[in-house]
Amino acid sequence: MKIYLVGGAVRDQLLGLPVKDRDWIVVGADPATLLSLGYQQVGKDFPVFLNPKTKEEYALARTERKSSTGYTGFICDFSPTITLEQDLIRRDLTINAMAQSEDGEIIDPYGGKQDLENRILRHISPAFSEDPLRVLRVARFAARYHSLGFKIASETLALMAELAQSGELQHLTAERVWLETEKALNEKNPEIYFETLHKTGALSVLFSEIDALHGVPNPVKHHPEVDSFIHTMLVLKQAVNLTENNPILNKSAVRFAAICHDLGKALTPQNILPHHYGHEQAGIKPTRSLCKRLKVPSYFQELAELTCEFHTHIHKAFELRAETVITLFNRFDVWRKSQRFQEFLQVCLADTRGRTGFENKDYPQIDYINQLLHAANEVDVQQVIADGFEKQAIKNELTKRRILAVKQTKTNYPTN
């Protein structure tokens, strides 16, 4: 029996990156052997065992043979005769198909180390096409390692495009698509994930609402980048910058809202382009459709829909009447969900800066709207009750006093 460290741990170690998870492969053993050594079996589909001391995962070496459509349609062989090389070749990319022996030797039968040095994401064999999930995984790796200069090999991109056209992607479950997408949203360059999926044709299959933004123009005065998809990717990049070092915000939810904020522009009638009157309200339906299909968590969906509807309110914050401001606060339920409103404001800032040449633009609207929020929050509901108001009258009086507080703050707010 031999044990090897495999996959991401070896890859990241060679890249000089911190190793998060360590996966191990056991060659020349069967389940009974590991159980006798105190390992605990946790996998039903695949024999995976927890080390009794470290609790790290150890899997028996295996081969896979395609038996039906989708990413689950495989027949696996876990016999003790399976070699390390046979196990490694079933993996997706050469950089993920390296192993390290217990004495520290790197086993690299498929050129992963060379591809690491050359910053190439390359598939190992034509068997890559047997698992449609790999299209998303490779796009996610491209997002993760883009800042290190990694590119996808042209032949791998071609295979990904073939998979996108084959109909295999439709067999992926919503949960798997969302899991990969949420992971991608947390990478350093999530825009590369979506750009890669567009390049391969997978975006139109899995994220048609986002893909529909391609080629939709904006007024060049406000959007020098013109194209709505390009703008959305720039907004996503800005959202990454704004959330990267902010542990309070739900960064993947903010980034998802950034992607959805202008989905309504794809529905703008041709005769009024490049203007997009009413795109805010129009964006709710495609956002809801996307979220329902991919079973996106409700928190993400709520933030994305609210962002679609109200992002231009913040752009025009200085023009809003006090009554409109309180209506906005009520819609976001800022009284109980203050963090969600702050996440929304970050998307609005990302939207302003996600335009060519506007990357460092000041956005005083956030300070202004937060001052109005502070004023509204200072209104004491207990005082309203103490003043003798009851039932529905409490709510009406509370709203009235909040509007008055906002009006006073607006009057006193410095205009320059």
Curated annotation (Swiss-Prot):
Binding site for Mg(2+): 21, 23
Single GO MF annotation: cyclic-nucleotide phosphodiesterase activity
Annotated residues for binding of CTP: 8, 11, 91, 137, 140
Location of the HD domain: 228-335
InterPro entries assigned to the protein according to its UniProt record, in alphabetical order: CCA_bact (IPR012006), HD/PDEase_dom (IPR003607), HD_domain (IPR006674), NT_sf (IPR043519), PolA_pol_head_dom (IPR002646), PolyA_RNA-bd (IPR032828), tRNA_CCA-adding_enzyme (IPR050124)
Note: A single active site specifically recognizes both ATP and CTP and is responsible for their addition.
Keywords of the record: ATP-binding, Hydrolase, Magnesium, Metal-binding, Multifunctional enzyme, Nickel, Nucleotide-binding, Nucleotidyltransferase, RNA repair, RNA-binding, Transferase, tRNA processing
Biological role: Catalyzes the addition and repair of the essential 3'-terminal CCA sequence in tRNAs without using a nucleic acid template. Adds these three nucleotides in the order of C, C, and A to the tRNA nucleotide-73, using CTP and ATP as substrates and producing inorganic pyrophosphate. tRNA 3'-terminal CCA addition is required both for tRNA processing and repair. Also involved in tRNA surveillance by mediating tandem CCA addition to generate a CCACCA at the 3' terminus of unstable tRNAs. While stable tRNAs receive only 3'-terminal CCA, unstable tRNAs are marked with CCACCA and rapidly degraded.
Family to which this protein belongs: Belongs to the tRNA nucleotidyltransferase/poly(A) polymerase family. Bacterial CCA-adding enzyme type 1 subfamily.
Name of this protein: Multifunctional CCA protein
GO annotation, biological process: RNA repair; tRNA 3'-terminal CCA addition
Cofactor field: Mg(2+); Ni(2+)
CDD domains (alphabetical): HDc, NT_ClassII-CCAase
Keyword Nucleotide-binding: yes
Coiled-coil regions, chain positions: none
Catalytic reactions of this protein: a tRNA precursor + 2 CTP + ATP = a tRNA with a 3' CCA end + 3 diphosphate; a tRNA with a 3' CCA end + 2 CTP + ATP = a tRNA with a 3' CCACCA end + 3 diphosphate
NCBIfam families assigned: PRK10885.1
Domain writeup: Comprises two domains: an N-terminal domain containing the nucleotidyltransferase activity and a C-terminal HD domain associated with both phosphodiesterase and phosphatase activities.
